[in-house]
Amino acid sequence: MAIEVEVESRQLDVWLEQQRIGELYEQGNLWALHYDPVWRDNGFDLSPALPRNAGEIQDGGSQRPVQWFFDNLLPEEGGRQLVAADAGINAADAFGLLQRFGPESAGALTLLSPGQQLPPPELRSLSDAELSARIQALPRQPLSHGAPKRMSLAGAQHKLAVVLEQGQLWEPIGQAASTHILKPDHEQVDHYPHSVVNEWFCMRLAGACGLPVPEVQVRRVPEPVYLVRRFDREGEGLHVRRRYALDGCQLLSLDAVFKYQQASSLTLRQLLDVTRTPAVTRLALLRWQLFNFFIGNADAHLKNLSFLWGEKGWELAPHYDLLSTAVYRAPDWGIETLVFPMGSATRFADVTKAEIGAFGQSIGVPVRLTLLELERLAKDLWREAQALLQAYEQGITHEVDPGEARLLRQIVYGPITDALAWASRWSRS
């Protein structure tokens, strides 16, 4: 005779600033979201798959929109293993991790235990010496170890949510919100050296070419760290407002494990369908795809696209996580797989003008306009890449590090040079 075991239910209250959205439940690994009546009448849907008019959304055995949505707030891969081990929680227990790290998760939502209240906003100074010690403790301990606020940020890399105010780093406490994301160099320095300056260079290059990107900078503590201003925050210091944003997986109701597998022109069109300005957004997505091709970014997946909610609907957020992965695969980087195929091309070296035109057409951009955008971006990118490299080498932007300078030259005269040549062909023959 089977013995029935009653599984305890767990609950978290979901907040956006001072507004209560509802309750998140989990029992027997099945999740449910119950909207607060006030939010149901006056708020907005957390995502297209979580409509307010349903009142309560319950996951099933195979379709789990609630779990997929909230799981996307947590770190991935090794980052999740590390914060879970540091907290003494099983990495497979996503709800338990949200209970622990919900007060400062990725995005704008705050997840609190029933009745829990956060202390008033406060900032604690984060000295360069303390930050350096935390970096040196990687990967044994996460960067958030010792932080006054339990924090969890989505993604696979080590990162820390901080406040940058007049050149000083601070850590948020209580109701205080972070303004910047901080990343050190990749822990596997032999395989991925100088990732900080790599991302800084590619983000600055994107901005110089007219792509929307947030402010970025490099700080040395003395280890280099990359700082990027959060596009989902407004204000400074203790007066920061959270803006609601979703990444591509959340907007499409996909588990994070599908961020590569489901990347296609079809999913881009599905994202376009929910934006308030699809014509503007499809051109922005075309430029984003072309830029990632030119720098050799083989990690431009669905979670690296985000959308901000406004009064009139969803709009594409500024770009982030732009870096050259190809520079670490030289000299045969052309065999790297494109995350979003272009036409029939699935590898970087297979891309031609014809394939780029086909990709543009597949997301609704006419071939002629696609090729005009290609020509403009190619011209701007080559000019700006050389100018930014020269500025770095002359010490205008940073104190020159020989290893960093060598990597930046490899990006410009490796992947960028190769990709520009491939994109100038009409065919592979």
Model regions and ranges:
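Phosphate/dinucleotide-binding and metal-coordinating scaffold of catalytic cores
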Residues: 1-429
